[in-house]
Amino acid sequence: MRSNYIVIEGLEGAGKTTARQLVVETLQSAGIHDMVFTREPGGTVLAEKLRSLVLDIQSTGDEVINDKAEVLMFYAARVQLVETVIKPALARGQWVIGDRHDLSTQAYQGGGRGIDRTMLATLRDAVLGDFRPNLTLYLDVTPEVGLQRARARGELDRIEQESMNFFNRTRARYLELAAADPSIRTVDATQPLDAVARDIRATIAQWMAEQPA
């Protein structure tokens, strides 16, 4: 099977780290071992600096980051990662497993922030072209459950400190996008861990069975 780009998405506390390990184990059981791991924003020297700027609550002092400036920083980090890490890895025949990609921007900025969705789609197409993940695994969790888990991890970043309404809008947009795109598979991440693990493994296995040899 040719190399593929698989992305794990979801609200804070959805369980993306655990899901990544389950994806890796499922791929390994199918004989796939050459993998590259990415996160967004981040994954390159430049992208990690942008990550600090956009997520660190102290990064800009008293200066509030404008919503459109935030979008552009996310895309700057994303383009750098795609062009210098993800595309070269895929060209080498490696599989890429990503913690977030463009769906996050469409959900968080388009849903949570309420930024014009046509503008976001136009910007995405301008900088990414037709580049898309082969599969996106969306871990659906309510904001109440997700934020409770996130708080248990420790100090929240700038995005994680947004209001419950922000995360409700973000989740609604995630669900809307997932319903419209067959390359996005949804897993109920509010279930007990063993049930989530079972569903993730089954989803990956089913998707792999659908792919050409």
UniProtKB/Swiss-Prot annotation:
<keyword id="KW-0547">Nucleotide-binding</keyword>
<dbReference type="GO" id="GO:0005829">
    <property type="term" value="C:cytosol"/>
</dbReference>
<dbReference type="GO" id="GO:0006227">
    <property type="term" value="P:dUDP biosynthetic process"/>
</dbReference>
<dbReference type="GO" id="GO:0004798">
    <property type="term" value="F:dTMP kinase activity"/>
</dbReference>
<dbReference type="InterPro" id="IPR018094">
    <property type="entry name" value="Thymidylate_kinase"/>
</dbReference>
<dbReference type="Pfam" id="PF02223">
    <property type="entry name" value="Thymidylate_kin"/>
</dbReference>
<dbReference type="GO" id="GO:0005524">
    <property type="term" value="F:ATP binding"/>
</dbReference>
<keyword id="KW-0545">Nucleotide biosynthesis</keyword>
<keyword id="KW-0418">Kinase</keyword>
<comment type="similarity">
    <text>Belongs to the thymidylate kinase family.</text>
</comment>
<keyword id="KW-0067">ATP-binding</keyword>
<dbReference type="InterPro" id="IPR027417">
    <property type="entry name" value="P-loop_NTPase"/>
</dbReference>
<dbReference type="GO" id="GO:0006233">
    <property type="term" value="P:dTDP biosynthetic process"/>
</dbReference>
<dbReference type="InterPro" id="IPR039430">
    <property type="entry name" value="Thymidylate_kin-like_dom"/>
</dbReference>
<comment type="function">
    <text>Phosphorylation of dTMP to form dTDP in both de novo and salvage pathways of dTTP synthesis.</text>
</comment>
<feature type="binding site">
    <location>
        <begin position="10"/>
        <end position="17"/>
    </location>
    <ligand>
        <name>ATP</name>
    </ligand>
</feature>
<dbReference type="InterPro" id="IPR018095">
    <property type="entry name" value="Thymidylate_kin_CS"/>
</dbReference>
<dbReference type="GO" id="GO:0006235">
    <property type="term" value="P:dTTP biosynthetic process"/>
</dbReference>
<keyword id="KW-0808">Transferase</keyword>
<protein>
    <recommendedName>
        <fullName>Thymidylate kinase</fullName>
        <ecNumber>2.7.4.9</ecNumber>
    </recommendedName>
</protein>
